[in-house]
């Protein structure tokens, strides 16, 4: 099997952008929207999917505006979940995952990403003892704000056509009027329940990273921050290329996408509590309770 590398981080931590940047170098075999949407469909083609996207008026992801195309790098969690498995890898889903690796095997290193596996990386390390891991981090307040924004966007009045193509579960939930009503109500920010739910997940995943990242040998892991990637994309990508022994990086095409906006009120009210709960993570990654990041850190 070709060398295997996982990009891991919280949802909305910058995994998509990092995956795009690395995919555009042409040095990796990556999973794409075409693979996910047409998985198991004989005779499918990127051109046919491109026409379908055009006919349905799907040009960008609702949550963040990322342009959609058959070649957009995507997460393997959808294939797992569409076949009845959890969104993260388990012993039961390894055979299906092996099929994904077989499809992607073209001689280049295989690069995959799945935020769901950020809190389950010890299993990946055990299941794939030669795999390497690229962890990307972002200030938790920004992660939570962005994740809540995406949740609210995909459960707004209009179905997210792109997510519906990717996820059978989303289609099923949307088709149930009662379920759709509940999620839409949560997406209004009622009682701040969506913020609390997302905050709990982010806190738990980051604490897991603090407690377990050192169990991975240093030769198998590298971490970077979204903030540093925005400030110096070429420098941070070169760190990854050096880590993977791939030489100099090609020229970049995807521009930086730093996003700044005032925190939503329901999140602002929780920042002190969150920074206290994640004090170890803040210290490890150089994040401050005021929502800023200390100067560049490399680990």
Residue ranges of each PLM-predicted region?
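PAPS-dependent sulfotransferases, especially Golgi type II membrane carbohydrate sulfotransferases
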Residues: 1, 148, 155-299
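Hydrophobic anchor at the beta1->P-loop junction of P-loop NTPases
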Residues: 7
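P-loop (Walker A) phosphate-binding loop of NTP-binding proteins
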Residues: 10
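A conserved segment at the C-terminal end of the G1
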Residues: 16-29
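A short acidic, amphipathic alpha-helical/loop segment
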Residues: 17, 120-127
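PAPS-dependent sulfation machinery
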Residues: 34-111, 177-183
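Short catalytic-loop micro-motif centered on adjacent basic/acidic residues
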Residues: 109-113, 223-225
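Conserved phosphate-donor/acceptor-positioning beta-strand/loop module used by diverse small-molecule
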Residues: 113-115, 124-149
């Amino acid at each position: 099997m070709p060398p295997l590398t996982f990009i891991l981080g919280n949802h909305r931590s910058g995994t998509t952008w990092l995956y795009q940047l690395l995919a555009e170098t042409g040095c990796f075999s990556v999973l794409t929207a075409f693979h996910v949407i047409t998985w198991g469909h004989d005779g499918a083609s990127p051109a046919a999917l491109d026409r379908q996207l055009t006919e349905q008026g799907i040009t960008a992801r609702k949550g963040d505006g990322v342009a959609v195309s058959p070649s957009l790098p995507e997460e393997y969690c959808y294939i797992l979940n569409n076949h009845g498995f959890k969104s993260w890898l388990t012993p039961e889903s390894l055979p299906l995952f092996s099929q994904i690796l077989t499809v992607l095997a073209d001689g280049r290193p295989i690069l995959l990403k799945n935020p769901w596996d950020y809190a389950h990386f010890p299993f990946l390390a055990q299941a794939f003892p030669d795999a390497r891991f690229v962890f990307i981090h972002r200030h938790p307040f920004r992660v939570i704000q962005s994740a809540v924004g995406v949740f609210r966007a995909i459960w707004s009045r209009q179905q997210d056509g792109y997510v519906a193509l990717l996820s059978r579960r989303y289609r099923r939930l949307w088709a149930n009027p009662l379920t759709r009503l509940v999620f839409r109500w949560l997406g209004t920010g009622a009682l701040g329940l969506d913020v609390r739910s997302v905050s709990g997940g982010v806190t738990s995943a980051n604490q897991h990273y603090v407690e377990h990242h050192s169990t991975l040998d240093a030769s198998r892991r590298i971490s970077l921050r979204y903030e540093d990637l925005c400030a110096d994309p070429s420098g941070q990508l070169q760190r990854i290329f050096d880590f993977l022994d791939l030489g100099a990086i090609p020229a970049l095409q995807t521009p930086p996408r730093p996003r700044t906006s005032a925190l939503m009120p329901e999140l602002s009210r929780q920042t002190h509590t969150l920074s206290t709960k994640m004090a170890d993570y803040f210290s490890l990654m150089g994040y401050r309770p005021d929502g800023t990041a200390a100067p560049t850190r490399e680990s």
